[in-house]
Amino acid sequence: SPSSIIPKFATEQAACFDLTACFEIGDKIKCIAQSQNETLRRATDRGIAIHPNERFLIPTGLILDIPQGYCVEVYIRSGISYKLGLTLNNCVGIIDSDYTEQLYISVANNSGTAQYIQKGERIAQAKLVKLVETVLEETLERPGLKTDRVSGFGSTGKN
């Protein structure tokens, strides 16, 4: 999109590049409203209004050309999550190398009030990740103990 913002790293040592919201006033943005029905909502001069418990696909205006053997991982920016209560619907977005459509950020409002995303606002961050070729094999035997772990959730570090 001509109005999209090229992703960039915010600092010299930033692990991820920032992704911004790309829309114009009047654009229709896809959302799942409180009624749980998919609908379109228009962006206004205040931005995109995301009410509590609503989910939106925020456009970035970007189409990524991801090399084969890589993926892009997408995370919500910590300030957006902490200050606004917005999260990614799937916690971490995974963009495969064969996806060649516009990138959208799937955002949910977990706060108790409406939140607004502004045009050009940095809402997510992403990184290019090299994939490790993995072969999955079925086995009928449980793996042997590798450490002194004896249980699951919250069990390590206890005597």
Task: Describe these PLM feature segments.
Residues S1-N159:
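DUTPase catalytic domain/fold
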